[in-house]
Every structure is written in structure tokens, then in C-alpha cells.
């Protein structure tokens, strides 16, 4: 039987980057609020989880055969990693994936504040 992975991130996000799953894996796209989520978790081997969204209760994973939860960002805010560890489920993230974007944002906001650009915009409007 092929491993089954649930993606709570739209598969289109991956396809747009020319990233496709192996033919040896079944990937099912679900929304975090799907009524099928608990049922599918019990039958799946892994989950791809976007970094942004509502928290997922650890009880969803009790009795599951999940071998890995992969977060597609740096943070673990959506999960209780300690509770998942107690269930034997490792959680992985992608630290530094958006570091350059964050640094660019910080520099642009700092320049905006130094140049009073937000006040200029208000006076134009």
C-alpha cells in the first residue's frame, strides 16, 4: 500500500513551483476545517501543514499512524510540539525559508520611518 500524505496547503502552491509528489505517494489536499480531517489523519502517514492558520488540537492525532508533520514555514505556532512528541510524532519545519524576505521588509520599514513616508502618504490622501 502506498504511503498517504495529507496536504493542508493547496497543492497548487507546489505545482506553481514545478514541485510534484513522487508517484509512490498518494497526496490528498484538505482544508484545516474539513469534516474529513480527523478521519483522514487516522489513515495517513504524514501531513504537510502551512505555517499560517488556526491551531490544530493534538487530540486529532491520537491513535493515528502519522510518522511526520512537515510545517512549510519556520514556526510551530499551530501545533503543541510537546504533546505531539509524547504521541511519538515528529514535527519538522523550514527555518530560514523566508529570512531574506523578512530582512528586506525590516529594512524597507526602517527607511520608511526614517524618511517619514507614512506621513507623506497621509498628506497626499
Task: Name these PLM-found stretches.
Residues 87-89, 95-125:
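Phosphate-binding beta-alpha-beta segment of Rossmann-like dinucleotide-binding domains, i.e.
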Residues 2-90:
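An N-terminal-biased, well-structured beta-alpha scaffold segment characteristic
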